[in-house]
């Protein structure tokens, strides 16, 4: 299920962008997806004591020099309560780049 949702987000992310822009976004999302391997990180994201806005800000703080489109994308994921699919999105984005 997460894979299907991730594919839709990747399609929206890739449409209208050149390979260099997509590769840069992929690099940034890969940095964040590595954090999902940490139990502490996952406990923060799954905590009901922390609202989605704060979780989104937390993830954005991990991304060095995020461009506005990536920042808006992460905010959208936060609003839709989909921050947990960032690793799937990063994987699908790598797959999509290989096809470009």
PLM feature segments, named:
Residues 1-100:
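Elongated, mostly alpha-helical coiled-coil "stalk/stator" tethers of large membrane protein machines
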């Amino acid at each position: 299920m997460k894979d299907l949702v991730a594919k839709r987000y990747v399609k929206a992310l890739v449409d209208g962008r050149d390979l260099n822009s997509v590769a840069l976004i992929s690099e940034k999302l890969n940095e964040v997806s590595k954090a999902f391997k940490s139990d502490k990180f996952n406990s923060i994201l799954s905590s009901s004591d922390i609202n989605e806005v704060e979780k989104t800000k937390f993830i954005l703080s991990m991304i060095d020099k995020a461009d506005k489109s990536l920042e808006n994308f992460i905010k959208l994921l936060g609003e839709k309560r989909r921050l947990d699919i960032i690793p799937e999105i990063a994987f699908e984005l790598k797959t999509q780049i290989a096809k470009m």
